[in-house]
Amino acid sequence: MSTTVPLHASSFSSGTTGAGGGVQQALQLQHCAYHVGASVGSSGSALNNNSINVPNNNTMGMSSAGSSNGSNLVNGQQRSTRGASKQRRDQINVEIQKLRDLLPLSDLIKDRLFQLQVMSLGCIFIRKHRYQQTVLQPQLQMLQMQMSSPMPRGIDICKALRGFMLMVTRSGKILHVSDNASEYLGHSVEEIMCQGDSIYDLVDGRDHGAVQAELASGPPGAATFPEERVFICRLNLARTAKRQLQYHKFVLFQGRYIQPAEFYQQLNAQNSQPDCDQPVFSAYCQPLINPENAEGMSTGNTHVFSTQHYLDMKFKEADTMASQHLGFSKEQLKGMSWYGMIHPNHVPEIAHKHRLLCQEKEGSVLALIRLQAANGEWIWLHTVFSIRPNNELNSDGKRLRHVIHCFHQKLTDLEAATLQANSWIYSMRHTYPTVFSCQDSPPPSEEQQPSSPQTPPFTEQPPMLVEQKPLIGAGIAPGFPSLDYNQIKVEIPMRPINTQIPLFTPESSSPESSASLHTSLLPHHNAFPLDILEDILPSNDVLPELKDEVDEILRQVEQSPATSPAHSFPSNVNFGHRHSMPNAFDSAELYKYLGPALFDGNFAMQHQHHLQQQHQSQPNHPLQMTPIPPMSCPPSNYGQSNFLFHHQHLNQHLHHSQPPHPYHFDYYNRKRSWAV
């Protein structure tokens, strides 16, 4: 028998998958498999009378232990067994070739299969046929009775899913992988199944525990059936260690057992062998977009849309699906600030990652955010931010050196809660380059040049906080005069960032397994999932990256000064869900890039008019209503007295100027004003 080589996905070429195989084909597969086993364990009855029989435990027809030279002693005479072994191997090869011909695959795929792969695929198709008759057939009959019209033939219903279909037994044995899996994983179904007949052959070893825990729990009882469950795992389709890192694919599994526990108990009671038919778990698998596959997955996927933004995150372009999900036309989105749609809880993290992209002019980052559509509904998005060079000219004739491309993947509440419980995905180092270079795009002037991440943080100028514009649809109250919205600003000093702590953790430090969620955690359909899942969220701290000089790094961390803020935050400040964020930003750089995008004049004008009415009796107050420099640079004459006055009276306004029954927009604006 020819020696089998290790299985590699590169050993195959793509091809179309044939039909699933009928009853006759499955019976023929079983018949060939039986003959292969009979040939392996035979005692040489097919040989002539002069041949020497090999014991039954000699599995592959090789000579016995005492005859390594291919001979054996019978009645004192030495006879050769090489001919018997070769004939037995030829019989096995013939039966395996019959199995190969019966597989419902294309000829191009069959010709590239090794013998071990033929046996593995044969087991998968035989197991699939067996479960179709016992477990799946009653479910199909029930679905056909519920349907008013029969399902047309030749239609692939998996195209309507947000991912590919996967069916496994409770022990992890693969029953079915839908044909559209190649569109998401980049490998044909045959290549995926040839990795092994178990799901654990495809899943990364660090996630074996999470997958096993989900499958081992078994189907629920009829009282709670069905029970949807969502979990994340990493699929690793490369068998070589050198290719594992770049071929990791984060996949979001959402599925359930297709029958309650009572069904399998009754089914196994009718069989002579206990646990003959295991429960079947069916799930559709949705790969998460990443900087490598985001552009490819956005094509033809109705749950992925893309947008383009200027460096201040104002919309430049949007595709058709963006208008469909957000409720705005392309013309309405152009020029609109992206920060005006984001939930305030996500502003600190997004502002920090946005600043990194604007600083380095390269790289990509991931984020889990909520955007508000035109109808006021919040939608969860798994987003990839990438900055790319650009040669276009704007309306003023100036060249747009860089454009930020965003790819958004829409999620359900349960999927978003699962990703929130696995927030380490959004702080992995592979989502952002470890080596930076800013030589490809010099800024037009030195005044607007962002500093390097190694630049010491500012200690004299605290970060600027300006009032955020109101929620979509909230206009200016009648009677307010048109004033310059750049006149009122609030400064809050914060602790400088520690440059010794890495911004993103390396991929190798990711957890050994992922967290999962069930529908039982969401008792109400409209309940906010993260409000009841705070106890399972991981720590927000980021551990330093320890290299060779461990003692030196620890000594630098211990000696780094930790300056306490000069003024405490108001009681209504909410800094939840910060996702391992640093505690401070560089004020000047943050204000340069986020000032024009974050803040609009409407809401600030309301606060300015309110403060003018309250303090008309104080003409000698230090606050002077004079124009200030443009939004691209912070005010130069903004002193400590201005901060004390604005901090005090803005607090009074936020605490005492609320209506008896606060409206949703007021709550949003109060949180937005302090979000950064």
Curated annotation (Swiss-Prot):
Residues 73-84 have a biased composition (Polar residues). GO terms for molecular function: DNA-binding transcription factor activity, RNA polymerase II-specific; protein dimerization activity; RNA polymerase II transcription regulatory region sequence-specific DNA binding. SMART domains: PAS (SM00091). It comes from the Eukaryota. The keyword Phosphoprotein does not apply. Residues 76-89 are annotated as: Basic motif. One of its GO terms (biological process) is positive regulation of transcription by RNA polymerase II. It is found in: Nucleus. Residues 45-72 have a biased composition (Low complexity). Keywords: DNA-binding, Nucleus, Transcription, Transcription regulation. Residues 76-129 form the bHLH domain. Residues 165-215 form the PAS domain. PANTHER family: DYSFUSION, ISOFORM D (PTHR23043:SF39), HYPOXIA-INDUCIBLE FACTOR 1 ALPHA (PTHR23043). Heterodimer; efficient DNA binding requires dimerization with another bHLH protein. Forms a heterodimer with ARNT homolog aha-1; binds DNA as heterodimer. This is PAS domain-containing protein cky-1. The lineage of its organism: Eukaryota, Metazoa, Ecdysozoa, Nematoda, Chromadorea. The gene is cky-1.
